[in-house]
């Protein structure tokens, strides 16, 4: 079957996974350089073979391609983490990508924003474009200004920072909780959800600093992270440990009140984590959101792609299609998702996977069809 593509007359949406791994990425260096006698990591070691390609997982990131009201395709990148440039070098040519019309940043962690400097490759000497529009929360903008002042004010650039010069050229846009915005004048609508009372919790942080030798007694607050709903066709939730109840009415419905076609949802590993959903939490959220298709992302190295496929097949059918004996990891994963209704479509994403949403809401992709 040939790769699905966004047809000229289509009013649908493409989504390409640039990265599906947590901040550490895969493979892990400690796994590839393990000492004799140490337990081998099947997931990381498999990346050294062609068969293990889907276990190579860069920082979570994706590209949305959707037709604007003028008929032109608009390219939106979600998050530019520590290995964004490597992901772009691999996947942009393969998918015919070049100009970036907008960048959306979910939160101010390194795996979401440390690739901002690499965007100079697009604006350097105006070879591709004179600037890139970047959409962030006020809190994220403040952190970018603190961490990379030359990206916000070019007088901080050591080389001078001429327009179309040696530093990236950005136009910054501050976006707000539950306030839909348009990507320039394209007609493309994005709804961010974060902030109080609506918030995606991505771990926790403390309200004050503790002395190094003492435990903090300060109040613990959720660390808030943006999710995005784009054109009522895609919900993106890459870094989340909890979805509050008042978020669900936003993310459960697509066009005309139908289920949203595609949900991209965090799943670090089998067990729960302070900053990320574990498998049981992810599947429970997927069942509640009720998207036509849910793609899991943000994986560590504890579970291989093949094992996630087996587990999610069980979620959908109540049985697996695998003809081989189940691994211990698969058995544990299936045990964790027992008790809920079957019939939902969930699969692990992988770097380079392309998902196509037709204007009618039907969904196909390049791996599962």
Report the location of each language-model feature.
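Active-site metal-binding motif and surrounding structural segment of the metallo-beta-lactamase
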Residues: 67-77, 81-136, 257, 261
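Residue-level signal for inorganic ion chemistry
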Residues: 15, 144, 294
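Active-site neighborhood of divalent metal-dependent phosphoester bond hydrolases
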Residues: 128-132, 138-172, 304, 310
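Binuclear metal-ion centers of metallo-dependent hydrolases, dominated by the metallo-beta-lactamase
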Residues: 244-369
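Short mixed-charge
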Residues: 152-175, 179-181, 320-340
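Structured loop/turn residues at beta-strand edges in well-structured enzyme cores
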Residues: 95-98, 168, 186-188, 256-258, ...
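Active-site flanking residues adjacent to catalytic metal/cofactor-binding acidic residues
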Residues: 78, 106, 237-238, 265, ...
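Core dinuclear metal-dependent hydrolase active-site scaffold
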Residues: 2-91, 95, 165-249, 350-369
């Amino acid at each position: 079957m040939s790769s699905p593509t966004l047809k000229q007359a289509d009013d649908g949406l493409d989504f390409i996974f640039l990265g599906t791994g947590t901040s550490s990425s895969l493979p892990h260096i400690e796994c590839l350089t393990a000492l004799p006698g140490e337990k081998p990591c099947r997931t990381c070691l498999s990346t050294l073979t062609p068969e293990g390609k889907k276990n190579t997982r860069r920082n979570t990131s994706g590209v949305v391609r959707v037709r604007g009201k003028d008929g032109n395709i608009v390219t939106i990148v979600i998050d530019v983490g520590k290995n964004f440039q490597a992901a772009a070098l691999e996947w942009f040519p393969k998918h015919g990508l070049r100009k970036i019309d907008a960048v959306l940043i979910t939160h101010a962690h390194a795996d979401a924003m440390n690739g901002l400097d690499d965007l100079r490759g697009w604006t350097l000497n105006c070879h591709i474009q004179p600037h890139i529009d970047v959409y962030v929360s006020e809190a994220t903008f403040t952190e970018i200004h603190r961490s990379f002042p030359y990206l916000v004010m070019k007088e901080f650039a050591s080389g001078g920072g001429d327009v179309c010069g040696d530093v990236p050229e950005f136009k910054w846009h501050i976006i707000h909780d539950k306030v839909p915005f348009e990507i320039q004048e394209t007609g493309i609508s994005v709804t961010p959800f974060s902030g109080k009372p609506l918030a995606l919790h991505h771990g926790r942080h403390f309200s004050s600093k503790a002395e190094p030798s003492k435990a903090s007694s300060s109040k613990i607050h959720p660390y808030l992270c943006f999710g995005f709903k784009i054109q009522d066709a895609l919900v993106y939730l890459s870094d989340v440990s909890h979805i509050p109840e008042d978020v669900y009415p936003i993310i459960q419905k697509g066009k005309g009140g139908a289920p949203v076609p595609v949900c991209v949802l965090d799943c670090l590993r089998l067990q729960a984590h302070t900053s990320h959903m574990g498998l049981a939490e992810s599947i429970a959220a997927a069942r509640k959101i009720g998207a036509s298709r849910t793609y899991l992302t943000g994986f560590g190295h504890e579970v291989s792609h093949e094992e996630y496929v087996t587990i999610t097949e069980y979620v959908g059918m109540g049985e697996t299609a695998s003809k081989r004996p189940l691994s211990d990891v698969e058995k544990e994963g299936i045990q964790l998702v027992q008790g809920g209704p079957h019939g939902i479509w969930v699969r692990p994403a992988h770097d380079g996977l392309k998902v196509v949403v037709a204007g009618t809401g039907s969904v196909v992709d390049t791996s599962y069809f």
